[in-house]
Protein backbone atom coordinates (compact mmCIF):
# COMPACT_ATOMS: atom_id res chain seq x y z
CA UNK A 1 0.00 0.00 0.00
CA UNK A 2 1.32 3.42 -0.94
CA UNK A 3 1.73 6.07 1.71
CA UNK A 4 -1.37 8.16 2.25
CA UNK A 5 0.58 11.38 1.66
CA UNK A 6 1.44 10.25 -1.87
CA UNK A 7 -2.17 9.38 -2.61
CA UNK A 8 -3.34 12.73 -1.26
CA UNK A 9 -0.74 14.51 -3.38
CA UNK A 10 -2.11 12.80 -6.47
CA UNK A 11 -5.65 13.85 -5.57
CA UNK A 12 -4.43 17.41 -5.12
CA UNK A 13 -2.82 17.29 -8.57
CA UNK A 14 -6.04 15.96 -10.08
CA UNK A 15 -7.98 18.89 -8.64
CA UNK A 16 -5.42 21.44 -9.86
CA UNK A 17 -5.37 19.97 -13.36
CA UNK A 18 -9.16 20.13 -13.51
CA UNK A 19 -9.19 23.68 -12.17
CA UNK A 20 -6.67 25.07 -14.67
CA UNK A 21 -7.47 22.81 -17.64
CA UNK A 22 -9.26 25.52 -19.62
CA UNK A 23 -6.55 28.14 -19.11
CA UNK A 24 -3.81 25.62 -19.83
CA UNK A 25 -5.47 24.58 -23.09
CA UNK A 26 -5.98 28.19 -24.20
CA UNK A 27 -2.39 29.23 -23.53
CA UNK A 28 -1.07 26.06 -25.12
CA UNK A 29 -3.14 26.66 -28.26
CA UNK A 30 -1.89 30.24 -28.55
CA UNK A 31 1.73 29.21 -27.96
CA UNK A 32 1.52 26.58 -30.71
CA UNK A 33 -0.38 28.74 -33.22
CA UNK A 34 2.07 29.85 -35.91
CA UNK A 35 -0.42 32.35 -37.31
CA UNK A 36 0.02 34.50 -34.21
CA UNK A 37 2.85 36.95 -33.74
CA UNK A 38 5.98 35.95 -31.88
CA UNK A 39 5.13 38.38 -29.08
CA UNK A 40 1.71 36.81 -28.54
CA UNK A 41 3.19 33.34 -28.51
CA UNK A 42 5.93 34.36 -26.07
CA UNK A 43 3.34 35.97 -23.81
CA UNK A 44 1.29 32.77 -23.85
CA UNK A 45 4.37 30.76 -22.86
CA UNK A 46 5.00 33.15 -19.97
CA UNK A 47 1.41 32.77 -18.83
CA UNK A 48 1.80 28.99 -18.98
CA UNK A 49 4.85 29.27 -16.75
CA UNK A 50 2.88 31.31 -14.23
CA UNK A 51 0.39 28.49 -13.72
CA UNK A 52 1.11 26.12 -10.82
CA UNK A 53 3.44 23.26 -11.69
CA UNK A 54 0.95 20.66 -10.57
CA UNK A 55 -1.65 22.12 -12.94
CA UNK A 56 0.21 20.46 -15.81
CA UNK A 57 -1.41 17.13 -16.75
CA UNK A 58 1.96 15.51 -17.42
CA UNK A 59 2.72 15.58 -13.70
CA UNK A 60 -0.14 13.22 -12.96
CA UNK A 61 0.73 9.63 -12.20
CA UNK A 62 -1.45 6.60 -12.89
CA UNK A 63 -1.86 4.64 -9.67
CA UNK A 64 -3.58 1.41 -8.73
CA UNK A 65 -7.06 2.11 -7.39
CA UNK A 66 -6.66 -0.51 -4.65
CA UNK A 67 -3.04 -0.33 -3.52
CA UNK A 68 -1.86 3.02 -4.89
CA UNK A 69 1.10 1.37 -6.61
CA UNK A 70 2.55 3.80 -9.20
CA UNK A 71 4.22 1.28 -11.49
CA UNK A 72 2.84 -1.63 -13.44
CA UNK A 73 -0.62 -0.08 -13.66
CA UNK A 74 -2.90 -1.07 -16.53
CA UNK A 75 -4.92 1.88 -17.82
CA UNK A 76 -7.77 -0.34 -18.95
CA UNK A 77 -8.45 -1.53 -15.41
CA UNK A 78 -6.82 1.17 -13.28
CA UNK A 79 -5.17 -1.60 -11.28
CA UNK A 80 -1.63 -2.81 -10.72
CA UNK A 81 -0.56 -6.01 -12.45
CA UNK A 82 -0.44 -7.98 -9.19
CA UNK A 83 -4.01 -7.00 -8.27
CA UNK A 84 -5.23 -7.80 -11.78
CA UNK A 85 -3.71 -11.26 -11.42
CA UNK A 86 -5.33 -11.83 -8.02
CA UNK A 87 -8.75 -10.63 -9.13
CA UNK A 88 -8.58 -12.53 -12.42
CA UNK A 89 -7.77 -15.81 -10.67
CA UNK A 90 -10.63 -15.18 -8.25
CA UNK A 91 -12.94 -14.58 -11.23
CA UNK A 92 -13.79 -11.02 -10.21
CA UNK A 93 -12.86 -9.44 -13.56
CA UNK A 94 -15.33 -10.45 -16.28
CA UNK A 95 -13.81 -11.73 -19.50
CA UNK A 96 -10.34 -12.34 -18.08
CA UNK A 97 -9.17 -15.93 -17.90
CA UNK A 98 -5.84 -17.61 -17.37
CA UNK A 99 -4.09 -18.25 -20.66
CA UNK A 100 -3.64 -21.84 -21.75
CA UNK A 101 -2.53 -23.16 -25.12
Curated annotation (Swiss-Prot):
<dbReference type="Pfam" id="PF00253">
    <property type="entry name" value="Ribosomal_S14"/>
</dbReference>
<dbReference type="GO" id="GO:0019843">
    <property type="term" value="F:rRNA binding"/>
</dbReference>
<keyword id="KW-0699">rRNA-binding</keyword>
<dbReference type="GO" id="GO:0015935">
    <property type="term" value="C:small ribosomal subunit"/>
</dbReference>
<dbReference type="InterPro" id="IPR023036">
    <property type="entry name" value="Ribosomal_uS14_bac/plastid"/>
</dbReference>
<keyword id="KW-0687">Ribonucleoprotein</keyword>
<comment type="function">
    <text>Binds 16S rRNA, required for the assembly of 30S particles and may also be responsible for determining the conformation of the 16S rRNA at the A site.</text>
</comment>
<dbReference type="GO" id="GO:0006412">
    <property type="term" value="P:translation"/>
</dbReference>
<comment type="similarity">
    <text>Belongs to the universal ribosomal protein uS14 family.</text>
</comment>
<dbReference type="GO" id="GO:0005737">
    <property type="term" value="C:cytoplasm"/>
</dbReference>
<protein>
    <recommendedName>
        <fullName>Small ribosomal subunit protein uS14</fullName>
    </recommendedName>
</protein>
<dbReference type="InterPro" id="IPR001209">
    <property type="entry name" value="Ribosomal_uS14"/>
</dbReference>
<comment type="subunit">
    <text>Part of the 30S ribosomal subunit. Contacts proteins S3 and S10.</text>
</comment>
<keyword id="KW-0689">Ribosomal protein</keyword>
<keyword id="KW-0694">RNA-binding</keyword>
<dbReference type="GO" id="GO:0003735">
    <property type="term" value="F:structural constituent of ribosome"/>
</dbReference>
Amino acid sequence: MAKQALLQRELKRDKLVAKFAKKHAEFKAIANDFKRTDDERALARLELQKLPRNANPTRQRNRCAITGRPRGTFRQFGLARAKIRELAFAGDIPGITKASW
